[in-house]
Amino acid sequence: MKVAISGGGTGGHVYPALAFIRELKKLHPEAEFLYIGTEKGLEADIVKREGIPFESIEITGFKRSLSLENVKTIMRFLSGAKKSKQILRDFKPDVVIGTGGYVCGPVVYAAAKLKIPTLIHEQNSVAGLTNKFLSRYTDKVAICFEEVSDSFASEKIVFTGNPRASEVVGVESEGALEAYGLESGKPTVLVFGGSRGARGVNEAVEAILPEWNKRDFQLLYVTGDVHYEKIKDTLADLNLGSHISVQPFIYDMPKILNAVTLVVSRAGATTLAELTALGVPSILIPSPYVTANHQENNARALEKNNAAIVITEAELKNTDLMATVDSILTDEEKLNAMKASAKQMGRPEAAAKLVEAVLGIMK
């Protein structure tokens, strides 16, 4: 069995692809994989480190306004589709999967034109431009949020969830908090704004640290590499207690997520898949800098089901974040209700469901 996968730009498109690959390997250890991405995207680094064969094409995204740059993008798309056809003819895959991002546009389009079975995976509650375009040509569209189903033909939709969810379930959490100077068994809040951090989130947390210093519950505050040194200098005079740990980055996130009580974070699709798979309540601060405001839409889906509290970045300045954290951690009934609601939304079987959908179009 040969499988070609394309998706990239951000981890939200790459990590689901890798989770799918690992799941399929369990059923078909003999399967061969080829990942098609760009050299500039995150996938070039992550996929190569996984030891998966990698080919690259050049592509950029469309501007949402009239622009001469879009003419260049069309030319790059056509060139990328031509190169993709050649790569696919050489590799001869049995199926081609797109997990989002601009790069999968020419790849999946080329596969469909070559009559190779195709499936795209939409992680968000708002369909991306690339997936909307590709859905006209693909055999199936795998989704994670019911809210996005109106964007695609109903006969093509299969609800799988995000395969990344399957990778955090059952992970051993022993020693996870101790590795960052915290105690296991104590209520702990994890705050993070993505791999690079988020300035708005950081500013809100910095403002409440003097108050947090008086609380009993622990804080694992992940600033992001870019902001760490500056924040570390700012906090030097606060004399923070040992129950507050400030870190630039977390490399063992699945372990940590299994050990914490509450998460304060952005609302990327992969993060939400992980939180709901584990039943972790959250305070979500969606990034306002993403296409079609999809993070807020993702977050509202959890809020509607009582699995999260949503605070937009615009609301942060007038919101007492400390009081919001207190309202959850000091109310056991509320905390447990949010846990149960998050768990109910989770799709820990998502990777297996996606594999099933892919194998189904190969028959």
Swiss-Prot record:
It comes from the Bacteria. The gene is murG. This is UDP-N-acetylglucosamine--N-acetylmuramyl-(pentapeptide) pyrophosphoryl-undecaprenol N-acetylglucosamine transferase. Its main location: membrane. Transmembrane segments: none annotated. Pathway: Cell wall biogenesis; peptidoglycan biosynthesis. Cell wall formation. Catalyzes the transfer of a GlcNAc subunit on undecaprenyl-pyrophosphoryl-MurNAc-pentapeptide (lipid intermediate I) to form undecaprenyl-pyrophosphoryl-MurNAc-(pentapeptide)GlcNAc (lipid intermediate II). Its EC number is 2.4.1.227.
